[in-house]
Amino acid sequence: MFDVIDSGGVIRSQAIENAEGTMRITMNGAENRKTLAGHFIAESFGSAIQHVAFESGDIFASLDALIRNGFKPLQISPNYYEDLDARFGLDDEMFDRLKSGNILYDRDDNGGEYFQLYSPIYGEGFFFEIVERRGDYAGYGARNAPFRIAAQKRSAPPAGMPRR
């Protein structure tokens, strides 16, 4: 179990997976509805799927195919990429591809890499995620969660606005 930081509080996250890592389920809980997960849980009366992630063998090719079909990725803050560059010192080409595609990145101590691409929120809080793992990266990109959550909150309609 690990904590994910949201500007509205802490989200408790528990990951469950099969031995091969081909099926992974992450369950989130929050003590208040000020967090993105807490609001979603409250609005869905405690039981719903907030997002579905698909694995890709090449996240950049997946992004290109999605864009050709009208997809617009969740817009990640430029500050994220400044922090990313300082943390990992990526080569210019990789850095530019991540930033221009709004792709999140993580690397573990063994050199395993993790790439994440998100859709905007649809309807009442549902979104898609595309992930690519390279090497033996076994995590879920928890370091990226606050940036994803902030981007989702920025893109959400203001509180009090009609939903439809």
Residue ranges and their predicted role:
Residues 7-164:
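Glyoxalase I/VOC metalloenzyme domain signal
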Residues 2-5:
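Short, solvent-exposed loop/turn elements at beta->coil junctions and helix N-caps
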